[in-house]
């Protein structure tokens, strides 16, 4: 039984290409048409470059004459640039109480605005203690006021709902 060669990441190069004919693009970007694989390999060796399979799923597969080391480096660079540009959306939490004072409320609003500017979602948790549970309407009104105050910069993702002793609302930036 023959050992199975491990699957290699990336495109096939030079002798790894096992097709009789390929669509060839030379090092200048000129389309040479359908060429026998031996001729394509000879052209690549004469140029001192590699024959790289660019599009294996087309018929015939598209191969290009280029410097494979440089090609790999540029692909890695593109991938790392794409990873840098991605931002992971976090869910930040703001905790309130039904009897919150106006200044405390304004401070919480400022930090919420900062979270929205950074592109994060905000989970607003309104916690009820003891007899405050009897006055859930106060908490609901507070969350409605908060919703109106951030309407310009955020939208409601999850409406206020009661879970045990706390009311939760999730907001996301516009």
Swiss-Prot record:
Gene3D superfamilies noted in UniProt: Translation initiation factor 3 (IF-3), C-terminal domain (3.30.110.10), Translation initiation factor 3 (IF-3), N-terminal domain (3.10.20.80)
Tagged with keyword Cytoplasm: yes
Subcellular location: Cytoplasm
Swiss-Prot/TrEMBL keywords: Cytoplasm, Initiation factor, Protein biosynthesis
Organism domain of life: Bacteria
GO-annotated biological processes: ribosome disassembly
GO cellular component, one term: membrane
Residue ranges of coiled coil: none
Gene Ontology MF annotations: ribosome binding; translation initiation factor activity
Cross-referenced HAMAP family: IF_3 (MF_00080)
Similarity comment text for this entry: Belongs to the IF-3 family.
Subunit structure: Monomer.
Role this protein plays: IF-3 binds to the 30S ribosomal subunit and shifts the equilibrium between 70S ribosomes and their 50S and 30S subunits in favor of the free subunits, thus enhancing the availability of 30S subunits on which protein synthesis initiation begins.
Protein name: Translation initiation factor IF-3
Source organism of the structure: Xanthobacter autotrophicus (strain ATCC BAA-1158 / Py2)
Gene that this polypeptide is encoded by: infC
């Amino acid at each position: 039984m023959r050992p199975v060669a491990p699957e290699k990441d990336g495109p096939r190069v030079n002798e790894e290409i096992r097709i009789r004919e390929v669509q060839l693009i030379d090092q200048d970007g000129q389309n040479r048409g359908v060429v026998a694989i031996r001729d394509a390999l000879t052209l690549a060796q004469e140029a001192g470059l590699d024959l790289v399979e660019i599009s294996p799923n087309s018929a015939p597969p598209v191969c290009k004459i280029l410097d494979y080391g440089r090609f790999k480096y540029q692909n890695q660079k593109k991938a790392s640039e794409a990873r840098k540009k991605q931002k992971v959306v976090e869910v930040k939490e703001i905790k309130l109480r039904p009897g919150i004072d106006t200044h405390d409320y304004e401070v919480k609003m400022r930090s919420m605005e900062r979270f929205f500017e950074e592109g994060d979602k905000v989970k607003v948790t309104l916690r009820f203690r003891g007899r405050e549970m009897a006055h859930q309407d106060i908490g609901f009104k507070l969350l409605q006021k908060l919703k109106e105050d951030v309407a310009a910069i955020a939208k409601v993702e999850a409406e206020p709902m009661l879970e045990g002793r706390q009311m939760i609302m999730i907001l996301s930036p516009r």
